[in-house]
């Protein structure tokens, strides 16, 4: 099981993941065993892209 650097961020990241997945049309749920690696990776990649953009706006 992975350890979160900031445990308090877990719920926020889950909500963010679900929002991004919904926008992309990827049906995320508590069980995602039926999703392809490509689908999961595209959601994660989009999350990172948006987080980097937000960070750069704050610089």
From Swiss-Prot:
PROSITE patterns linked to this entry: SASP_1 (PS00304), SASP_2 (PS00684)
Site (Cleavage): 19-20
Presence of keyword Repeat: no
Highest taxon listed in the record's lineage: Bacteria
UniProt keyword DNA-binding present: yes
One Pfam family named in its UniProt record: SASP
GO terms (BP aspect): DNA topological change; sporulation resulting in formation of a cellular spore
Sample GO molecular function, one term: double-stranded DNA binding
Keywords: DNA-binding, Sporulation
Gene3D superfamilies noted in UniProt: Small, acid-soluble spore protein, alpha/beta type-like (6.10.10.80)
Signal peptide location: none
PTM entry text: SASP are degraded in the first minutes of spore germination and provide amino acids for both new protein synthesis and metabolism.
Family label: Belongs to the alpha/beta-type SASP family.
Chain's role: SASP are bound to spore DNA. They are double-stranded DNA-binding proteins that cause DNA to change to an a-like conformation. They protect the DNA backbone from chemical and enzymatic cleavage and are thus involved in dormant spore's high resistance to UV light.
Protein name: Small, acid-soluble spore protein C1
């Amino acid at each position: 099981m992975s350890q979160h650097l900031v445990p308090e961020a877990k719920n926020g990241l889950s909500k963010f993941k679900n929002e991004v997945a919904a926008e992309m049309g990827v049906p995320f749920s508590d069980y995602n065993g039926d999703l392809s690696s490509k689908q999961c990776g595209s959601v994660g990649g989009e999350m990172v892209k948006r987080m980097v953009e937000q960070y750069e706006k704050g610089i």
